[in-house]
Amino acid sequence: MSTDSTDRRLRLAAIVLAVVGLGVAAYLTYVHYEGLRPVCGLGGDCEKVQSSEWSKLAGVPVALLGLLAYASILVALLVRREEALIAAALIALVGFGFSAYLTYRELFTIDAICPWCVASATIMTLLALATTARLVRTPRAIEVRYPT
């Protein structure tokens, strides 16, 4: 498989993941602002997670932060510039770290699991992997930002 073909597949996978993540984050943001109970499924406690102190950062719902992150990643992926690839990878890596922290809080502080939140964390993890793989496979992207 050629490098170009692999890059196209990784880019397409990342775009699909960003769109799905955007949908999940949009739903959670909508639920937050409308004051609705999220559809959670068996064994989940979305309402407990959504109403916890960890559901906001500086007064901003983390679902809205996720929405902005997924939208930013999607735009960066659609731009097709090397600097945009660096931006997408950085946003996804920060999102991965923040999602890991929030998942830790779900498990060990809130003592509840929100399947929507876990889905978003999984999507962000896969986005971080896909965008970082593209970045590593494209050495020129690093050279553009940090010339030798």
Which functions belong to the PLM regions below?
Residues 1-148:
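Membrane-interfacial helix-loop segments of redox and metal-homeostasis proteins
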